[in-house]
């Protein structure tokens, strides 16, 4: 499953799915489990690219040495967008919307007091670094994956997205003086999505960049340094992450910074283009996001391809949780450099874990990042 911080829903492709895209994936149903219980409750969700629908089922989810009885979605239809996505479902780890009726996996873990702390730590890898898997740690942070201390930013008003205030973007050492911007931290989005005027300004500072519709091209050899400032801390966005596939013109690549207003006029989607440069922590107790510079091995050249990424679309959820807020949230983001997560349950874990990182239960599983995805609901 794809780990998605931009959504709280968890679902898999069901064995009863009739859509062509389901044939490209592993499915799950009654023939795979004797304990699955299918309900009459319908669900559907439209992401930035793609839509799925189906029914809610209940079954036991097993991972990291213990079992969790949980409801989740079983997709009976899925749009063709999912044909090429290398995943068989989505594990939603975004904050739960207060209006949602179905508890999330994270809520159940918290209710049963299975975690050392009610936090999640995520480390994404790059293909160009020779590894396609990242790591997610439930209940703790992996200090071997980042340098320095974690800096925490409070989630802005609204609360059901990991949305934090953004100070500014700096290009080759020069601030662009953005004001009142916020960013949704979203592992389910491949790109960095900004309203057109914001994306125009950034690319105007990259030599020999050009625009076509919502897309931009830049020289494949560009060395322009981009930094994102959050809570007073600057985080690099390296060229190997924002310089994407080679276009039809030799030496010219597509930029993965996209000029598309996916949400509000001052809201950005901070996808994998940004997240591959940081270690990110999601604190459910204190409603905040922690960031630190990620440790990684350097490589010289980004991967190239003759195919540009598909155009993103902006669709809101239908019949499920409400879509993202239209108005940009504003709040003062606070920074903590203690490097310590918030304290969670003090109850002993109910099951041992083969990947325990301490005397308490800390769950670690591996994740892959799919290309050209925009997943928020």
UniProtKB/Swiss-Prot annotation:
<dbReference type="InterPro" id="IPR001969">
    <property type="entry name" value="Aspartic_peptidase_AS"/>
</dbReference>
<keyword id="KW-0325">Glycoprotein</keyword>
<dbReference type="InterPro" id="IPR001461">
    <property type="entry name" value="Aspartic_peptidase_A1"/>
</dbReference>
<keyword id="KW-1003">Cell membrane</keyword>
<keyword id="KW-0645">Protease</keyword>
<dbReference type="InterPro" id="IPR034164">
    <property type="entry name" value="Pepsin-like_dom"/>
</dbReference>
<feature type="active site">
    <location>
        <position position="4"/>
    </location>
</feature>
<feature type="compositionally biased region" description="Low complexity">
    <location>
        <begin position="328"/>
        <end position="351"/>
    </location>
</feature>
<keyword id="KW-0064">Aspartyl protease</keyword>
<comment type="similarity">
    <text>Belongs to the peptidase A1 family.</text>
</comment>
<dbReference type="InterPro" id="IPR021109">
    <property type="entry name" value="Peptidase_aspartic_dom_sf"/>
</dbReference>
<feature type="active site">
    <location>
        <position position="186"/>
    </location>
</feature>
<feature type="glycosylation site" description="N-linked (GlcNAc...) asparagine">
    <location>
        <position position="58"/>
    </location>
</feature>
<feature type="propeptide" description="Removed in mature form">
    <location>
        <begin position="351"/>
        <end position="377"/>
    </location>
</feature>
<feature type="lipid moiety-binding region" description="GPI-anchor amidated serine">
    <location>
        <position position="350"/>
    </location>
</feature>
<keyword id="KW-0843">Virulence</keyword>
<dbReference type="GO" id="GO:0006508">
    <property type="term" value="P:proteolysis"/>
</dbReference>
<dbReference type="InterPro" id="IPR033121">
    <property type="entry name" value="PEPTIDASE_A1"/>
</dbReference>
<dbReference type="GO" id="GO:0098552">
    <property type="term" value="C:side of membrane"/>
</dbReference>
<dbReference type="Pfam" id="PF00026">
    <property type="entry name" value="Asp"/>
</dbReference>
<keyword id="KW-0472">Membrane</keyword>
<protein>
    <recommendedName>
        <fullName>Probable aspartic-type endopeptidase CTSD</fullName>
        <ecNumber>3.4.23.-</ecNumber>
    </recommendedName>
</protein>
<feature type="region of interest" description="Disordered">
    <location>
        <begin position="296"/>
        <end position="351"/>
    </location>
</feature>
<keyword id="KW-0336">GPI-anchor</keyword>
<keyword id="KW-0449">Lipoprotein</keyword>
<feature type="domain" description="Peptidase A1">
    <location>
        <begin position="1"/>
        <end position="292"/>
    </location>
</feature>
<comment type="function">
    <text>Secreted aspartic-type endopeptidase which is secreted and contributes to virulence.</text>
</comment>
<dbReference type="GO" id="GO:0005886">
    <property type="term" value="C:plasma membrane"/>
</dbReference>
<keyword id="KW-0378">Hydrolase</keyword>
<dbReference type="GO" id="GO:0004190">
    <property type="term" value="F:aspartic-type endopeptidase activity"/>
</dbReference>
């Amino acid at each position: 499953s794809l780990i998605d911080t931009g959504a709280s829903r968890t679902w898999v492709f069901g064995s009863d799915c009739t859509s062509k895209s389901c044939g490209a994936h592993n499915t799950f149903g009654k023939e795979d489990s004797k304990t699955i219980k299918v309900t009459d409750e319908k669900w559907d969700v439209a992401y930035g690219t793609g839509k799925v629908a189906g029914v809610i089922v209940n079954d036991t989810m097993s991972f990291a040495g213990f079992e969790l009885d949980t409801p989740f979605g079983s997709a009976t239809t899925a749009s063709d967008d999912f044909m090429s996505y290398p995943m068989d479902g989505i594990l939603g780890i975004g904050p739960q919307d207060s209006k949602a009726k179905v508890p999330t996996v994270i809520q159940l873990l918290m209710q049963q007091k299975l975690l050392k702390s009610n936090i999640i730590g995520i480390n994404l890898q790059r293909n160009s670094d020779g590894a396609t898997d990242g790591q997610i740690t439930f209940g703790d942070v992996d200090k071997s994956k980042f340098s320095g201390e974690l800096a925490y930013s409070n989630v802005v008003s609204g609360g059901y997205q990991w949305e934090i205030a953004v100070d500014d973007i700096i290009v080759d050492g020069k601030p662009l003086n953005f004001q009142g911007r916020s960013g949704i931290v979203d592992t389910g989005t491949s790109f960095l999505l900004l309203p057109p005027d914001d994306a125009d300004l950034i690319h105007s500072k990259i030599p020999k960049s050009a625009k076509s519709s919502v897309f931009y091209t830049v020289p494949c050899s560009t060395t322009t340094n981009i930094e994102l400032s959050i809570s007073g801390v600057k985080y690099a966005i390296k060229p190997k992450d924002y310089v994407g596939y080679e276009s039809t013109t030799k030496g010219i690549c597509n930029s993965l910074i996209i000029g598309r207003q996916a949400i509000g006029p001052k809201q950005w989607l901070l996808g994998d283009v940004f997240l591959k440069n940081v270690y990110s922590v999601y604190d459910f107790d204190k409603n905040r996001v922690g960031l630190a510079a990620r440790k990684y091995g350097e490589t010289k050249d980004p991967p190239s391809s003759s195919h540009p990424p598909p155009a993103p679309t902006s669709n809101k959820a239908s019949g499920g949780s409400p879509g993202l807020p239209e108005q940009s949230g504003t709040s003062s983001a606070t920074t903590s450099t203690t490097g310590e997560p918030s304290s969670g349950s003090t109850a002993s874990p109910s099951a041992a874990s083969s990947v325990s990182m301490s005397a308490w239960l800390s769950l670690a599983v591996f994740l892959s990042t799919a290309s050209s995805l925009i997943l928020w609901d």
